[in-house]
UniProtKB/Swiss-Prot annotation:
Organism: Mus musculus
Subcellular location: Secreted
Residue pairs linked by disulfide bridges in the UniProt entry: C33-C126, C80-C132, C81-C134
Protein name: Interleukin-20
Taxonomic lineage of the native organism: Eukaryota, Metazoa, Chordata, Craniata, Vertebrata
Function: Pro-inflammatory and angiogenic cytokine mainly secreted by monocytes and skin keratinocytes that plays crucial roles in immune responses, regulation of inflammatory responses, hemopoiesis, as well as epidermal cell and keratinocyte differentiation. Enhances tissue remodeling and wound-healing activities and restores the homeostasis of epithelial layers during infection and inflammatory responses to maintain tissue integrity. Affects multiple actin-mediated functions in activated neutrophils leading to inhibition of phagocytosis, granule exocytosis, and migration.
Length: 176
């Protein structure tokens, strides 16, 4: 009976290891917090709406997230906190508020929001275990993002932030 249990356990472990890459789950290293996220699925959902959302953006001289380079400045220790704030920002101020008559786009945004909810849950666990440090620089950078968002009229800001989601996703990819 022990042999069966050992074989089953070994089979399960190998199955899990083989299955994980197929599902697109990636491990993100955020300082002392480590989470998994299906970045491949999030990228796919975003890529299906990116062009149409970016075409709505008429404020080409203003950036909310700036560039992936500016996000790279976030210290490793502060990444969990910074990402936690950005995930909440996208859930509360972007996905929830975005308006379009296009049902396909709304479905994709709903799917993106669901993926972000999973990330938020995992980041909350890190936060509750005190593994999500919030340094002054990370909070400054997040407040700059909020400031750029608030500069615009609400719907224009939402469109801008949604169109720039790729910047955040590329930054997350770099934490693998």
């Amino acid at each position: 009976m022990k042999g069966f249990g050992l074989a089953f356990g070994l089979f399960s472990a190998v199955g899990f290891l083989l299955w994980t890459p197929l599902t697109g789950l990636k491990t993100l290293h955020l300082g002392s917090c480590v989470i998994t996220a299906n970045l491949q699925a999030i990228q796919k959902e975003f890529s299906e709406i990116r062009d149409s959302v970016q075409a709505e953006d008429t404020n080409i001289d203003i950036r909310i997230l700036r560039t992936t380079e500016s996000l790279k400045d976030i210290k490793s220790l502060d990444r969990c906190c910074f990402l936690r704030h950005l995930v909440r920002f996208y859930l509360d101020r972007v996905f929830k508020v975005y308006q379009t008559p296009d049902h396909h786009t709304l479905r994709k945004i709903s799917s993106l929001a669901n993926s972000f909810l999973i990330i938020k849950k995992d980041l909350s666990v890190c936060h509750s275990h005190m593994a999500c440090h919030c340094g002054e620089e990370a909070m400054e950078k997040y407040n700059q993002i909020l400031s750029h968002f608030i500069e615009l009229e609400l719907q224009a800001a939402v469109v801008k932030a949604l169109g720039e989601l790729g910047i955040l996703l590329r930054w997350m990819e770099e934490m693998l």
